[in-house]
Amino acid sequence: MKRTKNINQETFRKEWRTHRLAPVALAVSAVFFLAGCEQTDETVSLYQNADDCSSANPSMAAQCTTAYNNALKEAEKTAPKYATKEDCVAEFGEAQCTQTPAPAQAGMAAEPQQSGGMSWMPLMAGYMMGRMMGGGAGFAQQPLFSPKTPASPANGQFVDAAGKNYGNAATGRTMTVPKTALAPKPATTSTITRGGFGETVAKQNSMQRSSASSNSSSSRSMGG
């Protein structure tokens, strides 16, 4: 009986230690999980050009210019492309479009071929600048566009090549975005029809509102 009693006491101690340590382990895991979540966002600044960036950050003039030039190159590859100037102007407004080589994989679109292998794209209206993904010392950038037509769901606002909206097209704004916002967008491989980019923006706006509403509901639930 004495041996059995000792065994039972030792088993009880082990179980007690296990139950006592479990909440601690869960708490530590939660801390690391939350820290990981916090690192998924990035603070970025939005500028219309390199001069605006340099004025706001005098010690970073070189980085501002480099980011701006890289954004211009990115815009040439990823901006929405249109077969005609009229289609581009209809979505982005007068004096907001420029001619560019037709997409590399334009498919069977006849219009670019008829205009000498050229298409039309919106001018870059600004760029987003933030730290590179992975915590590097350099900066990443993303070209931004801004429709100037009342019919556009993004009239007077900054949007990226994927149609995601970043609010008023004012220079010098700072905001928090997912790190994925700074990731390079796929190169444009075909032209779109008039109104096509506006539809993409509208869908993105709807998704952003839905996500914001979901996050708000989750916060209220967690807050009790």
Swiss-Prot record:
Regions annotated as coiled coil: none
Q: Where is the composition biased (Low complexity)?
A: 204-224
Q: Name one Pfam family in it.
A: DUF1190
Q: Note the InterPro entries from the entry.
A: Biofilm_formation_YgiB
Protein name from the UniProt record:
UPF0441 protein ECA0329
Give the highest taxon in the source lineage: Bacteria
- Annotated family: Belongs to the UPF0441 family.
- Positions of the UniProt region annotated as Disordered: 180-224
* Organism of origin: Pectobacterium atrosepticum (strain SCRI 1043 / ATCC BAA-672) (Erwinia carotovora subsp. atroseptica)
